[in-house]
């Protein structure tokens, strides 16, 4: 096998290298979901800048005694003689290590927002202010990493927070872009469209998950081989990932809501209320208090935890009542929809039927993922100045209360062109979907007269498109696009 490399993140890597090369005090905030590559980014930047290895400490979700015990364990591992007995000593230790030229990284920093640990922020503030006052004489720095953006913001960006306005730099890591993901898969697995869709639906752009599959030599294997190795063996690395890192954070709260949205992507507020507050057909409508509670749950899951996202039709205002809810993270959605129950049944059911069941459920979920992947490809091509469709608006779907549904609407002001797309995991369904697509597009154009005089294009998107289907679409005046067609400019 070819050795694993460092994929993507080139801009973030350059930014972090520049920070490390300043030879003066820095305090960096790095946020992003768990496993997204925050620690790997730091390690790579340290390696390229020739700095001494950083001192990494992962903060546990615990009380002060648990945190101090974990810190002392790390210190022993690094062969350092210091030990800490209080949070004040921990803050002072960080200051001393930074003055010695170390890069100190505190992972899961958001746990310091917990009441038993919050005093540490004031203690750290005192050290940070001293270091900032001597910035040109301090050769080291502090990096804080966190996976809950809202809690990191509360600790570092809230005006009343002790550490407000203390950071010198901020980085936010999102999923790997499609070009980097294609480079990774081209090197280690292959870029057959069906494989890419399967992996993206399951892992999205989380490099750690791809590396886990690579290390078990199943990244290039069949769907069921990969599922078995990653989820259904006793040593499977991702068997407890969602429960430990996503659902465990919630401690059992919001389970019903998360499962419903995962199984019904695109649910409206009314759909969720009906499903979660009405036990039967003859039940009373939900009370106002129940509606408020459900609204509060949705707000927490969207704004605090970022597990759910509310999407709007293209051109809709933020206050529009046509919003639809989706699980934001592909891995969490795949776990809730297809993997959680089969994995839980391993101890009392034959293994192979469970893997087959999970595979079939994942395949069903890939239809919605295809829409998201195609939209992401359009955006990435436009951002890079590639392809022939420069976007002037965020690409999105369109729907209304009258039943009009369009998978993707892409707008190009430069070329005065608007493109309507139908996405089908099964290419054989594309030809038959065009009549409905064109009818819905006409309703859209009547709704938005500003596009009169623009060129309207129609597009059929599938993972692969055979010559026969391509020709049939072309006879209807429809552009056929496979995933390979879409990402080809990224591979050139």
Question: Where does each model-flagged region fall?
Answer:
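Sensor-1/coupling segment of RecA-like P-loop NTPase cores
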Residues: 31, 111, 116, 120, ...
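Accessory nucleic acid-recognition modules appended to NTPase machines
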Residues: 227-403
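Conserved NTP-binding/hydrolysis module of P-loop NTPases
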Residues: 51-55, 60-82, 95
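Conserved small helical "lid"/interfacial subdomain of P-loop NTPases
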Residues: 168-195
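N-terminal pre-P-loop "Q-motif" helix
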Residues: 5-16
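Walker A/P-loop nucleotide-binding motif
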Residues: 25-43
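A cross-kingdom feature that marks ATP-driven nucleic-acid transaction machinery
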Residues: 323-492
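Amphipathic alpha-helical "lid/sensor" segments that cap RecA-like P-loop NTPase cores
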Residues: 186-244, 252
